[in-house]
Swiss-Prot record:
SMART domains attached to this UniProt entry: PX
Gene label: SNX20
One GO CC term, this protein: plasma membrane
Species whose genome carries this gene: Homo sapiens
Name of the protein in question: Sorting nexin-20
Cellular location(s): Early endosome membrane; Cell membrane; Cytoplasm; Nucleus
Role this protein plays: May play a role in cellular vesicle trafficking. Has been proposed to function as a sorting protein that targets SELPLG into endosomes, but has no effect on SELPLG internalization from the cell surface, or on SELPLG-mediated cell-cell adhesion.
Length: 316
């Protein structure tokens, strides 16, 4: 079984590897090395095929084809398109709009997010704790004593922050780090899972569908990282009486788990898919057999439901 889980910590597979080379000295990827995006640093230790996998020959071929494809590096471009000043009762700050697109092909799922200067500063502080040597040549745009809200200064800092993100992304260990992923996705995911817990399914779904494409691009080397969010999409659709859309989201999640029967989401997801398949008149027997085989090999004291598991994510 997977090692003990920490609530609020969606797991990702593989060891944490430290980067010892700069961008121009990057070595090819040899295994998943993304720390999972939760706050507690837990890693799912079950990567790769289960030794007791019951996959058919065709499924095995598809699995290894996916393994080859997963190492194709997805290249992203960061653009800070605009900035605006926002004033509140006791504070005044600049909000930057970040657009993230995939290069090399038409990207109809570009991500648009907003971050404050203080968010960038927190990212820099977090990265210095783990990657001080790796980012020593990356200049972070500092605040000035005066003039921070002048139009010329905002434009200058906008360009500098855009360059900053590009330089960070060029460093392999940084772009795969929990800190970088959290900066780009965690605020939206935390709000989405909060809405899920509150039963606000339309709003949760809106946020999830906005952030999921970016999360999947950032974790292309670690497909299971997006499983919690995909399961949240399944739950939203299911509770909004959209079983077909829920089933489609579940299929995407299962594809990312492949034969990883030890993953904490594997059995709860299969159980939910069996019920959806039955309701939709689809083949639920095959899914039921996979679930039963998994439970025989990895018996658990009490089956946790997919919803019980998913609502524990992003609590903090």
């Amino acid at each position: 079984m997977a090692s003990p889980e920490h609530p609020g910590s969606p797991g990702c597979m593989g060891p944490i590897t430290q980067c010892t080379a700069r961008t121009q000295q990057e070595a090819p990827a040899t295994g998943p090395d993304l720390p999972h995006p939760g706050p507690d640093g837990h890693l799912d230790t079950h990567s790769g095929l289960s030794s007791n996998s019951s996959m058919t020959t065709r499924e095995l071929q598809q699995y290894w084809q996916n393994q080859k494809c997963r190492w194709k590096h997805v290249k992203l471009l960061f653009e800070i398109a605009s900035a605006r000043i926002e004033e509140r009762k006791v504070s005044k700050f600049v909000v930057y709009q970040i657009i993230v697109i995939q290069t090399g092909s038409f990207d109809n799922n570009k991500a648009v997010l907003e971050r404050r200067y203080s968010d960038f500063a927190k990212l820099q502080k977090a990265l210095l704790k783990t990657f001080r040597e790796e980012i020593e040549d990356v200049e972070f745009p500092r605040k000035h004593l005066t003039g921070n809200f002048a139009e010329e200064m905002i434009c200058e800092r906008r360009r500098a922050l855009q360059e900053y993100l590009g330089l960070l992304y060029a460093i392999r260990c940084v772009r795969r780090s929990r800190e970088f992923l959290d900066f780009l996705t965690r605020p939206e995911l935390r709000e989405a899972f909060g809405c899920l817990r509150a039963g606000q399914y339309p709003r949760a779904l809106e946020l999830l569908l906005r952030v999921l494409p970016l999360q999947e691009k950032l974790t292309a080397h670690c497909p299971a990282a997006a499983v919690p969010a995909l399961c949240a999409v399944l739950l939203c659709h299911r509770d909004l009486d959209r079983p077909a859309e829920a089933f489609a989201a579940g299929e995407r999640a299962l594809q990312r788990l492949q034969a990883r029967e030890g993953h904490r989401y594997y059995a709860p997801l299969l159980d939910a898919m069996v019920r959806l398949a039955y309701a939709l008149g689809k083949d639920f027997v095959t899914l039921q057999e996979r679930l039963e085989e998994s439970q025989l090999r990895r018996p658990t004291p009490r089956g946790i439901t997919l919803k019980e598991l998913t609502v524990r994510e992003y609590l903090h």
